[in-house]
Amino acid sequence: MAESGEALGTVPEHERILQEIESTDTACVGPTLRSVYDGQPNAHKKFMEKLDACIRNHDKEIEKMCNFHHQGFVDAITELLKVRADAEKLKVQVTDTNRRFQDAGKEVIEQTEDIIRCRIQQRNITTVVEKLQLCLPVLEMYSKLKEQMSMQRYYSALKTMEQLENVYFPRVSQYRFCQLMMDTLPKLREDIKDISMSDLKDFLESIRKHSDKIGETAMKQAQQQKSFSIAVQKQTNMRFGKNMHVNNDRTLEEKSDIILKHTLEEEAENDEEVLTVQDLVDFSPVYRCSHIYSALGDEETFENYYRKQRKKQARLVLQPQSSVHETVDGYRRYFTQIVGFFVVEDHILHVTQGLVTRAYTDELWNMALSKIIAVLRAHSSYCTDPDLVLELKNLIVIFADTLQGYGFSVNRLFDLLFEIRDQYNETLLKKWAGIFRDIFEEDNYSPIPIGSEEEYKMVISKFPFQDPDLEKQSFPKKFPMSQSVPLIYIQVKEFIYASLKFSESLHRSSTEIDDMLRKSTNLLLTRILSSCLLNLIRKPHIGLTELVQIIINTTHLEQACKYLEDFITNITNISQETVHTTRLYGLSTFKDARHAAEGEIYTKLNQKIDEFVQLADYDWTMAESDGRASGYLMDLINFLRSIFQVFTHLPGKVAQTACMSACQHLSTSLMQMLLDSELKQISMGAVQQFNLDVIQCELFASSEPVPGFQGDTLQLAFIDLRQLLDLFMVWDWSTYLADYGQPASKYLRVNPHAALTLLEKMKDTSKKNNIFAQFRKNDRDRQKLIETVVKQLRGLVTGMSQHM
């Protein structure tokens, strides 16, 4: 039962498999058949049985179908057999017709072949003509290219190459000759680049050689333009200036018209001679090279090369020769080369596009300007000649004006000119120091003698001197100053003129120029003239008379300073009402010189007194005085009287101070002589002789050698000596010791130390001269008194030391 159940379940499965085999592609039969074997054991046998049964069923159906169509097939075969004879007939007819057609078409075929052959030839000819018409323009353009190359029309040649490559070659690119032509174009381009670069190098070398001439031409044009502007300005100032005199208006206008006319004539003559930069340099190579590299699409290479080479040339131009500072021609050559360089760059800037830009030229100029300033600052420091420095300044101004006309900033150059101006002033100061020294060396330091009205007017024309009393005097007469005063005044004015020459054309206002001139003049007065005066005053050969004249000279020079201020105001055309921040320091300069001269007078006077005092030859052990003053002292007093007579031309205080100083110094010298430590013994006779000399000094002081002293002021210079000598002459020790320290003391000016020193010298003398005097009562009493006084004086000296 189990087996029968399984068999019943297998049968539907086999039917499904058979249906699948019949309905699917044979490529998929394998998996279907595998499922038969994957089933129950002996399933494939049952499947085979089922398959055989299925095959038998299909055979039966085929047999049934064949039986059904068999009669129709037989009828069809019978019909075919009937039409076979007709088909044979038709074939024979077709073959015959074909043969007759073939025979008839042979001639047509031959004629047709001839026609075809002619048509092919005609087509080929047409094609050749078309191709030749296509190639001829290419060949003509290539021939044109060769002609342009031979005629050195390289930019046109490049344009022709572009046309060949973009228009003509694409039309005939299939031909071999086209490829050959195309292969030659890169080499032609390289040749053009090399040739144009060679031309550019020649151009760069040419402008390097012509920089001098280009710069000289540009600077000449700028100078002519400036001269014309100055002439017009001067004419305007002459016609409309505030300081013109009405009576001279017509004359000034006529002169200004003549000046302007001459300037215009010179301008016209120079214009005919002056060449432009285009006349001096052929710029076509740089134009061609620029166009060629632009056409080649390599503008950057060309620009970089040009700028690199020009920067190298700029460095060479900016490097001056070591001897540039020796002559003005060296500076001129240096400036013209630089101007020529930047004039060329400015021209290139305006005639090309992109080769040189304003930013590039400004950068190059700033680099050059820093180098120029460093060079000028270094080399100008070697210039010791003010004329050379002035010419250098004029060159720098023309140089700056020229480049400013081309749009370059030159403010730093004018700032440099202010530095050079300081150096110029230093060279001027050195030069005028020599001039002043020569004037002082040649001066005789005596008042200027005048013998006639002409001589008087000549001096007045040189120096602003006004003295109504002197004018009233008859000839011959004398100016109070010496001949150096008008010469110094003239030279100060010459210095101002020289300083003004540098200040011109600095693009500064009249007020600024006026201020600069005043500062320069102050330097001349305070540094140079003051130094020369001080050196003169300190020279050993300058005596008291010369010193007195120097003081008088400085007084008149000081008074002339206001005229120098007016002179500066006039030449700078500044209004008198303008408040000047800078004044001339003549007052302090000449006051210092006078003080130095006064001090030197005091010093020399004291030295002269010392010389006389050194001639003193006292016999310090003499028993009695000679009864008359010493000869050296009388000579000294006579000398002082003559000197103080010369001092009458000095200001009162100076003469009084000199007289008081001389008396005080004489008193001090006499006191030092009396108290000299090397002097061991002094007799009473020597003291009496010394007293006679002091009396002469007091008489001299009381004679009023210099007017202006009140009462016995001058005699007070000898008060210390007088009281000391009176103390010893009267031997009034009791009064001195009793009144010491009292304001009303008779011997208030006697110093205990001085009294002690002199008393000890006399004590030693008494001991030496009176060896046996101790046996006499009076001498013993005197000796005891001296010893007692000495002890008391020593006590006073000790008390003074402790108090101090």
UniProtKB/Swiss-Prot annotation:
<dbReference type="InterPro" id="IPR042045">
    <property type="entry name" value="EXOC6/Sec15_C_dom1"/>
</dbReference>
<dbReference type="InterPro" id="IPR048359">
    <property type="entry name" value="EXOC6_Sec15_N"/>
</dbReference>
<dbReference type="GO" id="GO:0000145">
    <property type="term" value="C:exocyst"/>
</dbReference>
<comment type="subunit">
    <text>The exocyst complex is composed of EXOC1, EXOC2, EXOC3, EXOC4, EXOC5, EXOC6, EXOC7 and EXOC8. Interacts with CNTRL. Interacts with RAB11A in a GTP-dependent manner.</text>
</comment>
<keyword id="KW-0268">Exocytosis</keyword>
<dbReference type="GO" id="GO:0006887">
    <property type="term" value="P:exocytosis"/>
</dbReference>
<dbReference type="InterPro" id="IPR007225">
    <property type="entry name" value="EXOC6/Sec15"/>
</dbReference>
<dbReference type="InterPro" id="IPR042044">
    <property type="entry name" value="EXOC6PINT-1/Sec15/Tip20_C_dom2"/>
</dbReference>
<dbReference type="Pfam" id="PF20651">
    <property type="entry name" value="EXOC6_Sec15_N"/>
</dbReference>
<keyword id="KW-0813">Transport</keyword>
<dbReference type="InterPro" id="IPR046361">
    <property type="entry name" value="EXOC6/Sec15_C"/>
</dbReference>
<dbReference type="GO" id="GO:0006886">
    <property type="term" value="P:intracellular protein transport"/>
</dbReference>
<dbReference type="GO" id="GO:0006893">
    <property type="term" value="P:Golgi to plasma membrane transport"/>
</dbReference>
<dbReference type="GO" id="GO:0090543">
    <property type="term" value="C:Flemming body"/>
</dbReference>
<keyword id="KW-0966">Cell projection</keyword>
<keyword id="KW-0653">Protein transport</keyword>
<dbReference type="GO" id="GO:0048471">
    <property type="term" value="C:perinuclear region of cytoplasm"/>
</dbReference>
<comment type="function">
    <text>Component of the exocyst complex involved in the docking of exocytic vesicles with fusion sites on the plasma membrane. Together with RAB11A, RAB3IP, RAB8A, PARD3, PRKCI, ANXA2, CDC42 and DNMBP promotes transcytosis of PODXL to the apical membrane initiation sites (AMIS), apical surface formation and lumenogenesis.</text>
</comment>
<dbReference type="GO" id="GO:0030218">
    <property type="term" value="P:erythrocyte differentiation"/>
</dbReference>
<protein>
    <recommendedName>
        <fullName>Exocyst complex component 6</fullName>
    </recommendedName>
</protein>
<keyword id="KW-0963">Cytoplasm</keyword>
<comment type="similarity">
    <text>Belongs to the SEC15 family.</text>
</comment>
<dbReference type="GO" id="GO:0090522">
    <property type="term" value="P:vesicle tethering involved in exocytosis"/>
</dbReference>
<dbReference type="GO" id="GO:0030426">
    <property type="term" value="C:growth cone"/>
</dbReference>
<dbReference type="Pfam" id="PF04091">
    <property type="entry name" value="Sec15_C"/>
</dbReference>
